[in-house]
């Protein structure tokens, strides 16, 4: 009775569209002890649904051949199929999905007993994690909504939260993401307040700080979901936010209390993120400028060019003052600027903002380029040189 309690498809549009765009579509349905069959050509039924045999199985098989008249190519990309089927296997613990590519006689089997925990483990492979995976499922009897969440922090600086409703991904998030974020931030703030961490460290943390390095999967099963569009890229069911927030609040608060070591490691990362954010703010202030570059404020020795059009300007980054001197003598002053950089430059891909900003050479480079840094301030249109030669 509960087989179709929740569904990704809402109106049957999917199979109708596939049917219309297929040269041929075959339906084989095992139900109530009988095998039913029907065939379509370019969306038109070839005969009514008919019984073709007996069965003790249940289920539906859909086979379709994309129309060459509609599509310029009808070759399936096995990587795209594998990615989606792996995702479905993670989202439905214990379901075994087999993908066969008969073109090259290859088979992929997706079977994950751990469900969302294994999903997080798969995403975090190769990264250093700060805590064991936190995973819970909570079903609400009054509205039929089931909330499942798995999460883990790692040593990266990116947030990776993926949201699903009835197995369908929402790349734009929605009410389930809002509920998750609210509960996560509240739970961590309450923990750090109770442990006096914020007063001790003298920092103010934000939700973004809490989610730095976080990998999380938020999956909800909703009987009657509402989306912002047919593509289902954003969930708008208001009751889901409350359901996720309540379930996450309870389970996550308990997790932090029961795992003090993990809680301290997570709090430490959040404090570091808050400090880095503050350093980034200072960096943005440093690189803000109303018009031309204030050369007097540069810690380096930029020899600027006369050209004011960035499209015609070149910046040469050279190592040390001696190379800088030679470059200045040989340059075309009209369009070529020279910036000597001393010492070994910092690998900013692996360094935090606070470390990056403490490097005088990096600071010089940021100011000379003029396009700013950070999510809010970076503007490539303000780049002062369209050619940069290292």
From Swiss-Prot:
It is an enzyme of class 5 (isomerase). InterPro entries: HATPase_C_sf, Ribosomal_Su5_D2-typ_SF, Ribsml_uS5_D2-typ_fold_subgr, Topo_IIA, Topo_IIA-like_dom_sf, Topo_IIA_B, Topo_IIA_B_C, Topo_IIA_bsu_dom2. It comes from the Bacteria. It holds the Pfam family Toprim. Residues 313-390 form the Toprim domain. GO terms for biological process: DNA topological change. SUPFAM superfamilies: ATPase domain of HSP90 chaperone/DNA topoisomerase II/histidine kinase, Ribosomal protein S5 domain 2-like, Type II DNA topoisomerase. Disulfide bonds: none annotated. Keywords: ATP-binding, Cytoplasm, DNA-binding, Isomerase, Nucleotide-binding, Topoisomerase. It catalyses: ATP-dependent breakage, passage and rejoining of double-stranded DNA. It is found in: Cytoplasm. The keyword Cytoplasm applies. Its EC number is 5.6.2.2. One of its GO terms (cellular component) is cytoplasm. One of its GO terms (molecular function) is DNA topoisomerase type II (double strand cut, ATP-hydrolyzing) activity. PANTHER family: DNA GYRASE SUBUNIT B, MITOCHONDRIAL, DNA GYRASE/TOPOISOMERASE SUBUNIT B. A type II topoisomerase that negatively supercoils closed circular double-stranded (ds) DNA in an ATP-dependent manner to modulate DNA topology and maintain chromosomes in an underwound state. Negative supercoiling favors strand separation, and DNA replication, transcription, recombination and repair, all of which involve strand separation. Also able to catalyze the interconversion of other topological isomers of dsDNA rings, including catenanes and knotted rings. Type II topoisomerases break and join 2 DNA strands simultaneously in an ATP-dependent manner. Belongs to the type II topoisomerase GyrB family. Few gyrases are as efficient as E.coli at forming negative supercoils. Not all organisms have 2 type II topoisomerases; in organisms with a single type II topoisomerase this enzyme also has to decatenate newly replicated chromosomes. Heterotetramer, composed of two GyrA and two GyrB chains. In the heterotetramer, GyrA contains the active site tyrosine that forms a transient covalent intermediate with DNA, while GyrB binds cofactors and catalyzes ATP hydrolysis. This is DNA gyrase subunit B. It comes from Acinetobacter lwoffii.
């Amino acid at each position: 009775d509960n087989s179709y309690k929740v569904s990704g498809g809402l109106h049957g549009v999917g199979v109708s569209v596939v049917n219309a765009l297929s040269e041929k579509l075959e339906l084989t349905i095992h139900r109530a002890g009988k095998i039913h069959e029907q065939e379509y050509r370019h969306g038109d039924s070839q005969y009514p649904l008919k019984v073709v045999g007996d069965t003790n199985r249940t289920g539906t098989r859909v086979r379709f051949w994309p129309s060459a008249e509609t599509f310029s190519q009808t070759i399936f990309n096995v990587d795209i199929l594998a990615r989606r089927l792996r995702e479905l296997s993670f989202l439905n613990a214990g379901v075994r999905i087999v993908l066969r590519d008969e073109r090259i006689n290859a088979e992929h089997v997706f079977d994950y007993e751990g469900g969302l925990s294994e999903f997080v483990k798969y995403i975090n492979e190769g990264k250093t994690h700060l805590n064991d995976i936190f995973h819970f499922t909570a079903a609400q009897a009054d509205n039929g909504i089931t909330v499942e969440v798995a999460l883990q922090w790692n040593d990266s600086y990116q947030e990776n939260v993926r949201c699903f409703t009835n197995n369908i991904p929402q790349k734009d998030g929605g009410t389930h993401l809002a509920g998750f974020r609210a509960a996560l931030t509240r739970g961590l703030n309450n923990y750090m307040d109770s442990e006096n961490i914020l007063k001790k460290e003298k920092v103010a943390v934000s939700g973004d700080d809490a989610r730095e390095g976080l990998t999380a999967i938020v999956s909800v099963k909703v009987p009657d979901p509402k989306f912002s569009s047919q593509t289902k890229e954003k969930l708008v069911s208001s009751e889901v936010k409350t359901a996720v927030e309540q379930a996450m609040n309870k389970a996550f608060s308990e997790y932090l209390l029961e795992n003090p070591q993990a809680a301290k490691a997570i709090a430490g990362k959040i404090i570091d993120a808050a400090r880095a954010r503050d350093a980034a703010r200072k960096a943005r202030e440093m690189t803000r400028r109303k018009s031309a570059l204030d050369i007097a404020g540069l810690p380096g020795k930029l020899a600027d060019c006369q050209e004011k059009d960035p499209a015609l300007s070149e910046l040469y980054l050279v190592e040390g003052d001696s190379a800088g001197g030679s470059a200045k003598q040989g340059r075309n002053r009209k369009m070529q600027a020279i910036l000597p950089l001393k010492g070994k430059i910092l690998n900013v891909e692996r360094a935090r903002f606070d470390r990056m900003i403490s490097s005088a050479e990096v600071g010089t480079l940021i100011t000379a380029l003029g396009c700013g840094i950070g999510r809010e301030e970076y503007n490539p249109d303000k780049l002062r040189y369209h050619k940069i030669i290292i």
